[in-house]
Amino acid sequence: MATYSTNEFRSGLKIMLDGEPCAILESEFVKPGKGQAFARVRIRKLISGKLLEKTFKSTDSVESADVMDMNLTYLYNDGEFWHFMNNETFEQLAADEKAVGDNAKWLVEQAECILTLWNGQPISVTPPNFVELEITDTDPGLKGDTAGTGGKPATLNTGAVVKVPLFVQIGEVIKVDTRSGEYVSRVK
């Protein structure tokens, strides 16, 4: 398996640390005036989701993680597993609640998602950056009621709650940024 030296660290690189695959979020290579150079790294463990800050000497090397990102289409949820399909081979994969996590509220049938696999098992699911969802419940926006923040909570058809502008009504379809969970626009 490939190894990376500390000067090859960059954001998004997947490495093995303590027997668990991790993704590097930030990497800073430091050359002090006196002493040995080192790399200061922020890491997210892909299975547990924990954030770590770790320092590596410039002479250290780490093993690359044997993880694979695949673009798959979300099919359905059977109550226990979320099912995805590879559009080229039509092979289906099932991800459990631990792999899907909080992203379940952004999964829409037929949406292209990124599944991260480790040893053939899904360890994380990344929904598309933007999804279009229907509003199932929100307070009515009264004309002239613009005092305050100018927003109201709205429940979407997946169960997610998003802050939307006052003019948005029940039954309308809106575009939501899944990375921040914020309203982007109305869909015509």
Swiss-Prot record:
It holds the Pfam family EFP. The keyword Cytoplasm applies. The modification N6-(3,6-diaminohexanoyl)-5-hydroxylysine is found at K34. Pathway: Protein biosynthesis; polypeptide chain elongation. Signal peptide: none annotated. One of its GO terms (biological process) is peptide biosynthetic process. InterPro entries: Elong-fact-P_C, NA-bd_OB-fold, Rib_uL2_dom2, Transl_elong_fac_P/YeiP, Transl_elong_KOW-like, Transl_elong_P/YeiP_cen, Transl_elong_P/YeiP_CS, Transl_elongation_fac_P. GO terms for molecular function: translation elongation factor activity. The keyword Iron does not apply. Gene3D superfamilies: 2.30.30.30, Nucleic acid-binding proteins. It is found in: Cytoplasm. May be beta-lysylated on the epsilon-amino group of Lys-34 by the combined action of EpmA and EpmB, and then hydroxylated on the C5 position of the same residue by EpmC (if this protein is present). Lysylation is critical for the stimulatory effect of EF-P on peptide-bond formation. The lysylation moiety may extend toward the peptidyltransferase center and stabilize the terminal 3-CCA end of the tRNA. Hydroxylation of the C5 position on Lys-34 may allow additional potential stabilizing hydrogen-bond interactions with the P-tRNA. Its main location: cytoplasm. SUPFAM superfamilies: Nucleic acid-binding proteins (SSF50249), Translation proteins SH3-like domain (SSF50104). One of its GO terms (cellular component) is cytoplasm. CDD domains: S1_EF-P_repeat_1, S1_EF-P_repeat_2. It comes from the Bacteria. Belongs to the elongation factor P family. Involved in peptide bond synthesis. Alleviates ribosome stalling that occurs when 3 or more consecutive Pro residues or the sequence PPG is present in a protein, possibly by augmenting the peptidyl transferase activity of the ribosome. Modification of Lys-34 is required for alleviation. This is Elongation factor P. The gene is efp.
